[in-house]
Amino acid sequence: MLGAVKMEGHEPSDWSSYYAEPEGYSSVSNMNASLGMNGMNTYMSMSAAAMGSGSGNMSAGSMNMSSYVGAGMSPSLAGMSPGAGAMAGMSGSAGAAGVAGMGPHLSPSLSPLGGQAAGAMGGLAPYANMNSMSPMYGQAGLSRARDPKTYRRSYTHAKPPYSYISLITMAIQQSPNKMLTLSEIYQWIMDLFPFYRQNQQRWQNSIRHSLSFNDFLKVPRAPDKPGKGSFWTLHPDSGNMFENGCYLRRQKRFKCENELALKEAAGAGSGGGKKTAPGTQASQVQLGEAAGSASETPAGTESPHSSASPCQEHKRGGLSELKGTPASALSPPEPAPSPGQQQQAAAHLLGPPHHPGLPPEAHLKPEHHYAFNHPFSINNLMSSEQQHHHSHHHHQPHKMDLKTYEQVMHYPGGYGSPMPGSLAMGPVTNKAGLDASPLAADTSYYQGVYSRPIMNSS
């Protein structure tokens, strides 16, 4: 400390003998021009803590050296701690190199400590840089913490992720009588979602447009319930309109049935000249299909097409009725197969591409039939209560098919294993055969064309 005080008492002209190169002044002045007050203040507090925790040699060396560097700085930094601005602006490597380069130009008493001082200062430089940037990061953190509050404040007024059909369905299902007037639907939506309290004319037009779909029915007022406007209720067949009760995604099965009913009605009116209603015709087709499958298929057995969805059974029955052919022509009778007969049936399906007992277009149907009966489809994920409700709309054999298919799907062996006992694996075996037949045919074809197998690249 005494040496430092003596050196600081020298005249400025004496310092020129210690700094032979003028670059030292230019580099320090450039650094001083680019420094800020915050970085120096943080470095001063940090350097004091570091010097207090360091050893005696290092703190003495750094103090002496900082006095030299501080004496060579511009007058604007003379009142601050020596060397604070110069070392705060340097990075780790640049600070170490700069201090090591200045070491030989210092006094002889400080030249042995040049390397040590460079190491100490170089290690502290990154922390000084980080602390000098900390006010900026703090402001950014405060601004980020402030944003979610405003976002959370306006989130309740955001548009809900439901379609208008979903909103109408929710309102009707949560009413005690399962029917609401148009004004009651409006009021329920506005009470639950504040977003719809604005621009009422726009979304109310969309609500009226959505009520015109086939999913909703208009119920006239009874004489004992006077008032204005008719009631609106859900279609009886649209009870499972949304997948697993989730109103974000709508199921396509009911939409498919509506389109097919309209197509069948148009085809019957133009070609057959029948005057029955579309609903009656669809029920007759469904009853005929169920009776045919029940009479031809023994108990515990399923035909290849019996596990198709109701939508496609309507399509197959309607097309066969319009053409004048019985519905049983598309699904031949199949006795209860033994394991040997199952293997023969699988080998027979793998053989010729055209089955003699089936029309050519029947080979293409099972591919999209089974898309609706995927193990993870909504039909197989339905609860037992929904299956019981589903069986009321259809005939009794559909309930038997659902149960048998559920037993097949819960069998631990999966698709490919043979079924022991009397439980038949009719649809599963046929599905495996139909899925494997084009692959086997293509493999044999390409093996005949090329001299070696396709997958063998060697």
Swiss-Prot record:
The keyword Transcription regulation appears for this protein: yes
Consequence the record notes for mutating T156A: Constitutive active. Abolishes phosphorylation by PKB/AKT1; inhibits nuclear export; no effect on DNA binding
Residues where Phosphothreonine is found: T156, T301
Record PTM: Phosphorylation on Thr-156 abolishes binding to target promoters and subsequent transcription activation upon insulin stimulation.
Region Disordered, residue ranges: 286-365
Transactivation domain 1 as annotated region, ranges: 14-93
Keywords: Activator, Chromatin regulator, Cytoplasm, Developmental protein, DNA-binding, Nucleus, Phosphoprotein, Transcription, Transcription regulation
Biological processes, Gene Ontology terms: adult locomotory behavior; anatomical structure formation involved in morphogenesis; anatomical structure morphogenesis; anterior/posterior pattern specification; cell development; cell differentiation; cell differentiation in hindbrain; cell fate specification
Biased composition (Polar residues): 294-310
Subcellular location: Nucleus; Cytoplasm
Disulfides per UniProt: none
Tree of life domain: Eukaryota
Impact noted for substituting L113A: Inhibits nuclear export
Membrane-spanning residues: none
Tissues where this protein is expressed: Liver.
Gene3D superfamilies to which the protein is assigned, alphabetical: Winged helix-like DNA-binding domain superfamily/Winged helix DNA-binding domain
Pfam families: Forkhead, Forkhead_N, HNF_C
Reported effect, R153K: Abolishes interaction with AKT1
Annotated Low complexity bias: 339-352
GO CC annotations on file: cytoplasm; nucleus; transcription regulator complex
Single GO molecular function: sequence-specific DNA binding
Its job: Transcription factor that is involved in embryonic development, establishment of tissue-specific gene expression and regulation of gene expression in differentiated tissues. Is thought to act as a 'pioneer' factor opening the compacted chromatin for other proteins through interactions with nucleosomal core histones and thereby replacing linker histones at target enhancer and/or promoter sites. Binds DNA with the consensus sequence 5'-[AC]A[AT]T[AG]TT[GT][AG][CT]T[CT]-3'. In embryonic development is required for notochord formation.
Subunit structure: Binds DNA as a monomer. Binds TLE1. Interacts with FOXA1 and FOXA3. Interacts with PRKDC. Interacts with AKT1. Interacts with TET1; this interaction may recruit TET1 to specific genomic loci to mediate their demethylation.
Protein name per the record: Hepatocyte nuclear factor 3-beta
Protein species of origin: Rattus norvegicus (Rat)
